[in-house]
């Protein structure tokens, strides 16, 4: 069993923003599955995938407190770190680029930073989705909370299903395979 966590902010006003790309990938994977409240501040659904069951989680905390929900879900389902994949936005990666890593630093992503602090380890897989632009504003917080332009949305709509495929490959074939196959520019 794998725990797949998509990072985002819970309020409706944050839907379809750069910061909520993790939620978008989780929703794509979930399809018509319904989400339930977990024992902790998160919503989840289970799906069956070629590599076995996947628990899809959306923390209902704000991004910067995502670690609380991740730890609660891991404890509830007794998930080890090697069976965890976190999906998040990354402003330091060009729009439309996927970067999967088996471990590493937060790289300035505050949701990842809190998860690392909460777990006491950087040893978990992450799938970063590039949301950066050429003309980044001085205020990164307003940038990540902004919606994509129409042109950017066309690219993101191509990236989300590729990210979902990468998650399925991570679950069935492992992080190294997913890295080799999916790391790079999608659009």
Swiss-Prot record:
- Locate the active site: 19
PROSITE patterns on file: PEPT_TRNA_HYDROL_1
Supply the gene name.
Answer: pth
Say which family it is in: Belongs to the PTH family.
Q: What is its EC number?
A: 3.1.1.29
- What HAMAP family does its record include? Pept_tRNA_hydro_bact
Q: What is its main location?
A: cytoplasm
Q: Does the keyword RNA-binding apply?
A: yes
Q: Name one GO biological process term.
A: protein quality control for misfolded or incompletely synthesized proteins
Q: State the name under which the record lists this protein.
A: Peptidyl-tRNA hydrolase
List positions binding tRNA: 14, 62, 64, 110
Name the job this protein performs.
Answer: Hydrolyzes ribosome-free peptidyl-tRNAs (with 1 or more amino acids incorporated), which drop off the ribosome during protein synthesis, or as a result of ribosome stalling.
List, alphabetically, the PANTHER family matched: PEPTIDYL-TRNA HYDROLASE
Which domain of life does the protein's organism represent?
Bacteria
Residue numbers marked as site, Discriminates between blocked and unblocked aminoacyl-tRNA: 9
Q: What does the subunit section of this Swiss-Prot or TrEMBL entry state?
A: Monomer.
| Catalytic activities | an N-acyl-L-alpha-aminoacyl-tRNA + H2O = an N-acyl-L-amino acid + a tRNA + H(+)
Return the Gene3D superfamilies for the record: Peptidyl-tRNA hydrolase
InterPro entries assigned to the protein according to its UniProt record, in alphabetical order: Pept_tRNA_hydro, Pept_tRNA_hydro_CS, Pept_tRNA_hydro_sf
Origin species, per record, is Chlorobaculum tepidum (strain ATCC 49652 / DSM 12025 / NBRC 103806 / TLS) (Chlorobium tepidum)
Q: Which UniProt keywords apply?
A: Cytoplasm, Hydrolase, RNA-binding, tRNA-binding
């Amino acid at each position: 069993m794998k725990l797949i966590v998509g990072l985002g902010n819970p309020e409706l006003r944050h839907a379809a923003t750069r910061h909520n790309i993790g939620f978008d990938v989780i929703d794509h994977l979930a399809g018509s599955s319904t989400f339930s409240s977990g024992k902790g501040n998160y919503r989840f659904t289970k799906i069956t995938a070629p590599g076995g069951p996947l628990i899809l989680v959306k923390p209902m905390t704000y991004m910067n407190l995502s670690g609380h929900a991740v730890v609660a879900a891991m404890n509830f389902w007794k998930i080890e770190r090697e069976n965890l994949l976190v999906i998040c936005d990354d402003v330091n990666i060009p729009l439309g680029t996927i970067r999967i890593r088996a471990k590493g630093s937060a790289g300035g992503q505050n949701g990842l930073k809190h998860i690392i602090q909460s777990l006491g380890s950087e040893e978990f897989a992450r799938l970063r989705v590039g949301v950066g632009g050429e003309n980044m504003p001085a205020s990164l917080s307003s940038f990540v909370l902004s919606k994509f332009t129409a042109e950017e949305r066309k690219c993101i709509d191509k990236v989300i299903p590729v990210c979902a495929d990468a998650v399925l490959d991570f679950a069935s074939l492992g992080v190294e395979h997913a890295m080799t196959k999916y790391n790079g520019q999608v659009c």
